[in-house]
Amino acid sequence: MKTELPRKFILGFALAAALFFIFMVSSRPLLALGVLFLSHLLILFPTLVANCPWWGPVVTRFETPRREVWLTIDDGPDPIHTPRMLEILERFEAQATFFVIGERAAKYPNELEAIRAAGHEVANHTATHPSGTFWCYPPGRIADEIDRGVASRYFRAPAGLKNFFVHPALARRGMQLVGWTVRGLDTVKKDPAAVAALILKRVRPGAIVLLHEGHRTASEPDFHPHCLELTLAALTNANYRCVLPGKW
């Protein structure tokens, strides 16, 4: 999909709407407010809808003729979950990309190295995971979050939220923005079986599957590893393999 046209249109429309508001608010206030409101909606939609490509390309699947999926695991590394998840991945002969947080990678270097040593991939999920504010960061802070994260060809924004400064920053670094096809909502749901069932219901060949690690509670210290185990069992029973896709 060509994304440069909607990007330029949205920014151009926002500028025109601001000028229209300035010149028309006194004579046609409702019309001026309506145009300004529409311009804000056009900016917010690709910002807050994770897989929307209007600001630039978002990888949401990969091409394959086989029953293969790309498993991605966000928010690690974690000293408890990462070793357990690596053991589960090995048992199911599955590969995964771990989108790690830079500060956690620096805090847990052994777990980060264990991911790589097991043949999995490490990707950038910002330095601090500012999920509530990243989408409104200016260019300098976005660049800082990317640069202090791990070196990788792939980047995933916190909660998938991104503004129009993200793609230029990634392009300058030769990186791609990765979204997802299906997620298990494992930071919301409380039942690992429900997480696995949701993924299996929506998965298709070439899907990007999103799971998490590191969100531990006293009642469910192994919740995310359990989600991974049940998800891999369900995918295996459905004859899916978890692979690392090549470059696009």
Give the location of each predicted region.
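Active-site beta->alpha N-cap acidic-glycine motif
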Residues: 43-134, 168, 172, 185, ...
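An active-site-proximal "capping" alpha-helix that borders the catalytic cofactor pocket
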Residues: 139-152
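A structural signal for short, hydrophobic/glycine-enriched beta-strand patches
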Residues: 126-128, 139, 158
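N-terminal pre-catalytic segment of deacetylase/amide-hydrolase enzymes
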Residues: 1-71, 79-91, 230-248
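Divalent metal-coordination and catalytic microenvironments
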Residues: 74, 89, 98, 122, ...
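Short beta-strands and strand-loop turn motifs
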Residues: 123-127, 179-181, 208-214
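His/Asp/Glu-enriched short active-site or ligand-binding loop at hydrolase and phosphoryl-transfer sites
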Residues: 161, 166-202, 240-248
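Catalytic grooves of carbohydrate-active enzymes
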Residues: 199-247
